[in-house]
Amino acid sequence: MADSSFDVVSKVDRQEVDNALHQAAKELTTRFDFRNTGASIEWSGEETITLNADTEERLLAALDVFKEKLIRRDISLKAFDAGEPAQSGKIYKLSGTLVQGISSENAKKITKKIRDEGPKGVKAQIQGEELRVSSKKRDDLQGVISLLKGEDFGIALQFVNYR
C-alpha cells in the first residue's frame, strides 16, 4: 500500500481578504464615529494594505474594524502582519502585509516538532514554501495534524491534499 500524505501550507484566499477590505471600507464611510476623521483602508500593492486616519486612536479603531471583518471571513489574524502606526504630516498611516508561505526557519521548527513529538514512521519534507508529511498509517497523519494545531508557530497553517 502506498504512503498516505498531506501538505502543510500557509495561504490566504485573496478574494476573501478583498471582500473583508471592502466591507471594512464601507463601514468606515458609514459609521458615525468615523465621520470627518479621514479614515480609509485600501490595497497598496499585491500583499500590502494601508490604513489612514487623522488620529492614532481612529487609526487603531479602523484596524480593529478590519480585523473583525477578517475574522468573520474565517481568515486567521496570523495571516495579517500589521505594522506600527506612523505619522506623516497630519495623517497617521499603518501598513500591513499578508503573510503567505512557510519560511524556512518555521518549516524547520515544524519538522523538528514532528520528528520529536510525532508518531514513529512519519516523514516531513520541506518543498519550497510548503511541507509534505507522509506516513504508512492515516491515523498517524491525523495525530500529526492535531499536534500541529495545538502548537503556535506564529503563522496560519492549513492542511491540504490529504491522500
From Swiss-Prot:
GO MF term list: nucleotide binding
Protein family membership: Belongs to the YajQ family.
Pfam families xrefs: DUF520
Stored HAMAP family: YajQ
Signal peptide residues on this chain, from the entry's feature table: none
Taxonomic lineage: Bacteria, Bacillati, Actinomycetota, Actinomycetes, Mycobacteriales
InterPro entries linked to this entry: DUF520, UPF0234-like_C, UPF0234_N, YajQ-like_sf
Coiled coil: none
GO CC term (a single one): cytosol
Protein name: Nucleotide-binding protein RER_17110
CDD domains: YajQ_like
The entry's keywords: Nucleotide-binding
Functional note: Nucleotide-binding protein.
